[in-house]
């Protein structure tokens, strides 16, 4: 029970400190620096840092749901996920310099989270932390299936995640936050036994890239190329194109929003109209009074 209390305390302390740092950055930094850099670094830290608490499987899914739910409410749209930043670039919602700054901020947040994790384990606040500190140099891989299957699983998880984000991007946080949190929790429960269901290159690089069992190239194929492929497919399915790269819709035909009214075309000035059947036409030069020989 003491270990559980330590883990929960560490979880909420990390989240509270990151939220305080985010608010201070928003107040002190220029708007561009905060939106592009600081909030991404803080979200990456708050997403990766709390897992140093080493939760058991009985609490992991519940805390994962609460973490993503809190993210949706407090972190101003920051993603802490490189594939989400690349999605915004492909959707023409972010410029290339802004995207590169977000990726750099996420890398910085990842390094800060790793440092925080090692520091927490070194304190040996619980028996689990002591065990993690001893096993840090010989951790086991999160990839527990073949490389092609793992890449397919990560791509499928990322596809569902990004397609949901695209459908809910204009929805109020009160609806999108719980929906995304529930999706991430269900995905982690379903795909967790195979790849741990990261579908986040920064999170995967922080947690499992240093572990033995697979080469760096195999990890890159599963945890970087897999989510990137799933994200691109989600954008293509949702938009029919990659807006930043292609203007032409590759999948869906575009219908004209404004349709011309269906009316009879106006006759040209030189056109002669055909008289209607049964109507009389007067010849030029004849008066309206009929002659004596008319019957």
Curated annotation (Swiss-Prot):
Kindly indicate whether the keyword Iron belongs to this entry. no
Q: Where this protein primarily resides, as one coarse class?
A: membrane
Cellular location(s): Membrane
- List the molecular function annotations (GO) for this entry: channel activity; water channel activity
| Keywords linked to the UniProt accession | Membrane, Repeat, Transmembrane, Transmembrane helix, Transport
One GO term describing the cellular component: membrane
Q: Which stretches are Cytoplasmic in the membrane topology? A: 1-22, 75-76, 115-120, 167-174, 245-295
- Could you tell me which residue ranges are on the Extracellular side of the membrane? 42-55, 143-145, 192-194, 207-223
Identify the stretch(es) annotated as Disordered: 257-295
Membrane association type? Multi-pass membrane protein
Q: Which Pfam families match?
A: MIP
Short sequence motif NPA 1: positions: 81-83
Q: Per the record, what are the reactions this protein catalyses?
A: H2O(in) = H2O(out)
Q: Where is this motif: NPA 2?
A: 200-202
Intramembrane residues, please? 77-114, 195-206
Per the record, the similarity remark reads: Belongs to the MIP/aquaporin (TC 1.A.8) family. AQP11/AQP12 subfamily.
Q: What does this protein do?
A: Putative aquaporin. Could form homotetrameric transmembrane channels, with each monomer independently mediating water transport across the plasma membrane along its osmotic gradient.
Per the record, the domain comment is: Aquaporins contain two tandem repeats each containing three membrane-spanning domains and a pore-forming loop with the signature motif Asn-Pro-Ala (NPA).
Q: Its quaternary structure? A: Homotetramer; each monomer provides an independent water pore.
Q: What is this protein called?
A: Putative aquaporin-12B
Query: Lineage of this protein's species?
Result: Eukaryota, Metazoa, Chordata, Craniata, Vertebrata
């Amino acid at each position: 029970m003491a270990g559980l209390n330590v883990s929960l305390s560490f979880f909420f302390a990390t989240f509270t400190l990151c939220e305080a740092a985010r608010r201070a950055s928003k107040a002190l930094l220029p708007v561009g620096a905060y939106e592009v850099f600081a909030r991404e670094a803080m979200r990456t830290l708050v997403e990766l840092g709390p897992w140093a608490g080493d939760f058991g499987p009985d609490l992991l899914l519940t805390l994962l749901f609460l973490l993503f739910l809190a993210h949706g409410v407090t972190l101003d749209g920051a993603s802490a996920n490189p594939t989400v930043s690349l999605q915004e670039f492909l959707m023409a919602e972010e410029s290339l310099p802004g995207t590169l700054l977000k990726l750099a901020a996420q890398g910085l947040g990842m390094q800060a989270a790793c440092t925080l994790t090692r520091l927490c384990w070194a304190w040996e606040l619980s028996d689990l932390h002591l065990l993690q500190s001893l096993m840090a140099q010989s951790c086991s891989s999160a990839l527990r299936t073949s490389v092609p299957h793992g890449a397919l699983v990560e791509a499928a998880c990322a596809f569902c995640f990004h397609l949901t984000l695209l459908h809910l991007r204009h929805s109020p946080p009160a609806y999108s936050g719980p929906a995304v949190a529930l999706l991430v929790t269900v995905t982690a429960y379903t795909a967790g036994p195979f790849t741990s269901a990261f579908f986040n290159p920064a999170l995967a690089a922080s947690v499992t890239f240093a572990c033995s069992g697979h080469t760096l190239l195999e990890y890159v194929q599963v945890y970087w190329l897999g989510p990137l492929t799933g994200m691109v497919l989600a954008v293509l399915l949702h938009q029919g194109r990659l807006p930043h790269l292609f203007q032409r819709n590759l999948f869906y035909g575009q219908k004209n929003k404004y349709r011309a009214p269906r009316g009879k075309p106006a006759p040209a000035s030189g056109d002669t109209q055909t008289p209607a059947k049964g109507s009389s036409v007067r010849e030029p030069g004849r008066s309206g009074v009929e002659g004596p020989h008319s019957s």
